[in-house]
A protein has these predicted regions:
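Long, charged low-complexity terminal regions
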Residues: 271-573
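Terminal, regulation- and interaction-focused segments at domain boundaries
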Residues: 29-81
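Non-transmembrane, interaction-prone alpha-helical and coil segments associated with secretion
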Residues: 82, 162-169, 176-187, 191-243, ...
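Intrinsically disordered, low-complexity segments enriched in serine/proline and basic residues
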Residues: 2-16, 20-24, 31-34
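Amphipathic, interaction-prone secondary-structure segments
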Residues: 80-136, 454, 531-532, 536-545
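Ampiphathic alpha-helical segments that act as solvent-exposed interaction surfaces
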Residues: 29, 38, 71, 75-80, ...
Length: 601
């Protein structure tokens, strides 16, 4: 995933249109949102106002930075929708050489709609492998296409899709993606299957993926169809649905390529992945600072993502324990423990690595044993976890949400957000100050007048085309800053208002101080309880990994492995059903798979 290429002063529309990869959103389609959906989540939260977690806790950076995938992550909701609506999927074309170079086509039939995922594969030198947006070569390049792919379209895709940003698409193309093979494991897996062996769990058990994606584009980029182009009953008329269908099939390609190359190398001796391994690998992904501007520029989207989680958590916390519920929760705790116990002991600072989560889960199991037979046991378990710290509380949140049985039709609707807002220039200074105190009173806790609060500014690098933080004492912005300094802008706006007459219209303030226009616009747009992380992106203490992890968890990613303070690697769809397994008996308990334990010769 990569950065939104937006600069300071861009309109909200431009910010949405220019946003890259999985961050591409759907806000351009406001006119198509059902009339009740814009306020539906707020109504649901209001009905639970005495039970939901306050924003003062839920939006703390350390809490967001401990989030884990849940039942309402986008990967999970996509597959549940596929099962509920009777989707079928499979491979319809494969033309690869012995090294896995060539083309493959998968199809998904979703009711009356058919979609094709067309992938072109090659090999490049290991030195050319990079997760950066400036890469110009990839081993895998694919496109999700509306309908079947005829010869003419396939010929065009062969030219345009491998070009990615340099290519040009049309509205038949719904999503564009690319990536590379795992340098460490692809060849090893081919060799083992070619020799008639399953992989050695000690060699690849903590790998988690065969291919690693580096971007998913959609929503009108390069001429593709925009979210506004989907009618209301379209299967992809849900945020991120098209991208996650593409990601699921991208993951399938990894299995198919390895098994094809193994057969080419081993002939009759070759075997495919057995039952223990055939779901274990997911799709790798790497993400950097590009996630941060997206989260900071879309407060209502962030509110929806957090609000859905908080709504479901509130329901479970007050739930009466059914006879089988306790056993179900114990099963999820045990499953999580087994999954993380077989993971790595790598340094994942500032997060806990897999091995460190094992004693945490042992404590959770013990705590559940103490409260299970008492009054309001789910609430008691959560309150205990909150006192243990964010890593424990958010692990327990993820586990408790597995007990929630919300209506997916409703939840799909709740993720649709109307981001339009407009400021009233006749509003008085007193009215604006009251709104600022109500919505951003927490800014006073951030020491925003101190020098460390304004140490950095954000810029899109000329060399890498990615967001970077620059030291203000070493490089002046000169109008190139990416406007993610929300806390500072609103704080300074408030300071200016202190010197103005209470009855003065805010338009007069902006006439004298036009630099505060964006602050006023943000104040108006930030009208939801969960829209603002309680943090300052320009401070020396700011840790981008925290908001990144929250966003990745909402996507459905796990196995967070930071490489520094600004970027990390993750895994998606690990344990998920394969294309051929999709059917009415497909269950939603595929997450947290156990590492295969045997190596059959």
């Amino acid at each position: 995933m990569h950065p939104p290429r937006v600069g300071g002063g861009c309109s909200a529309w431009q910010a949405r249109v220019e946003t890259l990869p999985l961050e591409r959103t759907y806000a351009a389609a406001v006119s198509l949102i059902p009339p009740t959906s814009a306020d539906a989540l707020q109504a649901e939260l209001a009905a639970r106002s005495g039970r939901i977690r306050p924003a003062a806790y839920a939006m703390r950076p350390e809490v967001l930075g401990a989030a884990r995938l849940s039942r309402y992550s986008f990967s999970r909701t996509m597959l549940r929708r596929a099962v509920a609506d009777g989707w079928t999927a499979g491979r319809v074309h494969q033309d690869l050489d012995a090294e896995g170079r060539g083309e493959t086509i998968y199809v998904v039939d979703a009711g009356t709609q058919r979609f094709s995922f067309v992938v072109f594969t090659t090999t490049i030198d290991e030195s050319a492998h990079t997760d950066r947006v400036i890469a110009d070569r990839w081993e895998v390049a694919g496109a999700l296409v509306d309908g079947d792919v005829d010869d003419d379209l396939l010929a065009r895709l062969r030219i345009e899709v491998p070009e990615q940003e340099s290519g040009r698409m049309d509205p038949r193309i719904l999503s564009l993606t690319r990536g590379n093979r795992s340098v460490r494991f692809f060849g090893y897996l081919v060799d083992e299957l070619a020799a008639g062996r399953q992989p050695d769990p000690d060699q690849v058990g903590d790998a988690g993926y065969i291919l690693r994606s580096t971007a998913f584009y959609a929503n009108g980029k390069f001429g593709m169809r925009s979210f506004a182009g989907y009618p209301g009953d379209h299967p992809f008329r849900v945020p991120y649905r098209a991208q996650f269908v593409a990601a699921w099939m991208f993951r399938e390609l990894g299995y198919d390529m390895v098994e094809h190359c193994a057969r080419a190398k081993g002939g009759d001796n070759a075997v495919g992945f057995d039952g223990e391994w055939c779901r274990y690998f997911g799709l790798g992904n790497a993400t950097g600072l590009g996630l941060v501007p997206y989260a900071l520029k879309h407060p209502r989207v962030l509110d929806a993502w957090v609000g859905v989680r908080e709504m479901a958590l509130a329901d479970v916390r007050e739930r009466v324990v059914a006879p089988t519920d306790g056993a179900v929760l114990r099963g999820w705790i045990a499953k999580a423990r087994e999954h993380f116990a077989s993971g790595s002991n790598d340094d994942c600072t500032p997060f806990l690595n897999s091995q460190a989560l094992v004693p945490l889960l042992d404590d959770v199991a013990e705590a559940w044993g103490r409260v299970a037979d008492g009054a309001d046991p789910y609430d008691a378990l959560y309150l205990w976890a909150e006192n243990q710290g964010p890593e424990t509380s958010e692990m327990v949140v993820s586990l408790l949400l597995e007990l929630h049985d919300g209506d997916d039709d409703l939840f799909d609707l709740l993720f649709l957000v109307d981001e339009h807002s407009s400021a009233d220039p006749t509003a008085t200074v007193a009215e604006v100050r009251a709104k600022l105190d109500e919505r951003f009173g927490w800014l006073g806790e951030l020491n925003l007048d101190e020098p460390p609060a304004d140490a950095f500014w954000w810029v899109v690098s000329d060399n890498t085309e990615e967001p970077r933080r620059a030291r203000r004492d070493r490089l002046a912005p000169e109008g190139r800053d990416v406007a993610v300094d929300v806390a500072l802008r609103l704080w300074r706006f408030g300071r200016t208002l202190e010197d103005r007459h209470a009855d003065e219209p805010v338009a007069a303030v902006l006439a004298d101080h036009p630099e505060h226009r964006m602050a006023l616009e943000r104040l108006v747009a930030s009208d939801r309880r969960y829209g603002e992380p309680r943090d300052n992106t320009c401070a020396t203490s700011y840790l981008p990994l925290q908001i990144q992890r929250f966003q990745l968890a909402q996507y459905g990613m796990d196995e967070f492995k930071p490489k520094d303070t600004d970027w990390l690697r993750v895994t998606l769809f690990q344990g998920a059903p394969r294309l051929a397994e999709l059917g009415p008996d497909t269950t939603d308990d595929w997450v947290l798979p156990a590492r295969p334990t045997s190596r059959k010769e």
